[in-house]
């Protein structure tokens, strides 16, 4: 993402990170709401952002990864260099929830029942004026 948006990415052969790392976070970011200033995260990378794209700021860093988390709140772009989806990142689920609910504005009220009811209404509406042939064995 950083490279595609005009930033620069370098190879960190000697500074690569694999395993647990303590990330220092700027907790003023919506993405990091309720997450501590220093958290353990699971890293697995050999490349890193060397120059941020215009409008971005660093919201997380380690001693060997100066841009472990970045954001451009104005454009709605957020990126992390670690793995929030794994158990080895204890606050990863909180970060994902923040992305969904704080950043993207998801509501969290979706249920399979609501989906089924909505699809039945849509189908009934489409079939109200249609001809239907439904052979059965």
Enumerate the predicted regions with their spans.
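RNA-binding accessory domains that recognize and position tRNA/RNA substrates
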Residues: 3-137
């Amino acid at each position: 993402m950083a490279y595609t948006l005009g930033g620069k990415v370098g190879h960190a052969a000697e500074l690569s990170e694999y395993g647990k790392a303590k990330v220092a976070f700027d907790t003023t970011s919506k993405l990091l709401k309720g997450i501590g200033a220093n958290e353990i995260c699971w890293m697995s990378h050999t490349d890193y952002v060397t120059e941020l794209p215009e409008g971005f700021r660093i919201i997380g860093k380690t001693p060997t990864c100066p841009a472990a988390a970045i954001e451009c709140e104005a454009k709605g772009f957020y990126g992390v260099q670690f793995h929030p989806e794994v158990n080895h990142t204890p606050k990863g689920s909180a970060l994902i929830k923040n992305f969904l609910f704080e950043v993207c504005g998801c509501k969290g009220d979706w249920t399979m029942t609501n989906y089924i009811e909505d699809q039945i209404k849509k189908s009934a509406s489409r079939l109200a004026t249609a001809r239907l042939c439904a052979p059965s064995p």
